[in-house]
């Protein structure tokens, strides 16, 4: 990494409020790019469009998914755009490079019975479960990102309005309501979880030492809950966000409301959940409509 790349990453962190997970992805993309430069005896400031095309081929030769390749190219395009603001002699070699089309996929989510099983795992009021349950409740009840969760302060919780104020992408604040189960888990956590009572900061979610929990720490907690839950496998923080959106739409929430709750700028981003919701609608239709199936069909 050189000083320009370090400055670029610092700008993303300070001015654009990128999460540590996203910053790590950008850093990894730059490191891989630097390795390619060294391997091909190329220089960062003389890198050309034809070199960019060769780099695209190099990425595909490593059997990466199109989504991964697209992200890596986007990282480098953004980096050169930043560099151009500092040096008028720099040309962005990635600006004309066509993004590989992203693979279409349906968001993964948990069924309601799977969520019930996860909550049952952290039902007993042990010290660890008090903290783990509040993480699970907040992520499922509000659909917030993990980067938003770890930055919640105690004063961001509004027990009168039953909701939480979070700082989303682009440093945009939004208020997200939560229900009775989530409220109760927060109250129990604040009252009985000893590490939160003795810490000298205002962060809501802490580890067993009373330190503000990290995104990595949240992922560890969620993986541990899954390991202790029979019949549930594979979890990532965004899966709970997908579950939140899917369950709301399945119960009749309109797309604009879900967009606002998730903090999406574009409605099209929220729209991907309607495909999942439509599957649920078809399932209900097939089970309920008297002429949905022929007699010999199951």
From Swiss-Prot:
It comes from the Bacteria. The active site is at residues 145, 169, 238, 241, 264, 273. Residues 105-286 form the Tyr recombinase domain. Keywords: Cell cycle, Cell division, Chromosome partition, Cytoplasm, DNA integration, DNA recombination, DNA-binding. It is found in: Cytoplasm. Its main location: cytoplasm. SUPFAM superfamilies: DNA breaking-rejoining enzymes (SSF56349). The keyword Lipid metabolism does not apply. GO terms for biological process: cell division; chromosome segregation; DNA recombination; DNA transposition. CDD domains: INT_XerDC_C. GO terms for cellular component: cytoplasm. One of its GO terms (molecular function) is DNA binding. Residues 1-84 form the Core-binding (CB) domain. Site-specific tyrosine recombinase, which acts by catalyzing the cutting and rejoining of the recombining DNA molecules. The XerC-XerD complex is essential to convert dimers of the bacterial chromosome into monomers to permit their segregation at cell division. It also contributes to the segregational stability of plasmids. PANTHER family: PHAGE INTEGRASE-RELATED, TYROSINE RECOMBINASE XERC. Forms a cyclic heterotetrameric complex composed of two molecules of XerC and two molecules of XerD. Belongs to the 'phage' integrase family. XerC subfamily. This is Tyrosine recombinase XerC. It comes from Staphylococcus aureus (strain NCTC 8325 / PS 47). The gene is xerC.
């Amino acid at each position: 990494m050189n000083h320009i790349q370090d400055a670029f990453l610092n700008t993303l962190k300070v001015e654009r409020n990128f999460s540590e997970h996203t910053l790590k992805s950008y850093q990894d993309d730059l490191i891989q790019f630097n390795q390619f430069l060294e391997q091909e005896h190329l220089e960062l400031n003389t890198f050309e469009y034809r070199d960019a095309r060769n780099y695209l081929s190099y990425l595909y030769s490593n059997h990466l998914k199109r989504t991964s390749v697209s992200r890596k190219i986007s990282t480098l395009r953004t980096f050169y755009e930043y560099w151009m603001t500092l040096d008028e002699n720099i040309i962005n070699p990635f600006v004309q490079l066509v993004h590989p089309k992203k693979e279409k996929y349906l968001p993964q989510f948990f069924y309601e019975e799977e969520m019930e099983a996860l909550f049952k795992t952290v039902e007993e009021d042990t010290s660890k479960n008090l903290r783990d349950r509040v993480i699970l409740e907040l992520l499922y009840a509000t659909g917030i990102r993990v980067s938003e969760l770890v930055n919640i302060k105690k004063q961001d919780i509004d027990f009168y309005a039953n909701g939480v104020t979070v700082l989303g992408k682009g440093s945009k604040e939004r208020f997200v309501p939560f229900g009775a189960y989530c409220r109760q888990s927060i109250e129990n956590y604040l009252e009985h979880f000893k590490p939160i009572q003795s810490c000298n900061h205002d962060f809501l979610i802490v580890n067993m030492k009373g330190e503000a929990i990290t995104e990595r720490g949240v992922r560890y907690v969620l993986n541990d809950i899954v390991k202790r839950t029979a019949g549930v496998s594979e979890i990532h923080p965004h899966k709970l966000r997908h579950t939140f959106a899917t369950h709301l739409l399945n119960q009749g929430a309109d797309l604009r409301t879900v967009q606002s709750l998730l903090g999406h700028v574009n409605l099209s981003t929220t729209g991907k959940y309607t495909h999942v919701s439509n599957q649920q609608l078809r399932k209900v239709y097939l089970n309920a409509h008297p002429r949905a199936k022929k007699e010999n069909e199951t």
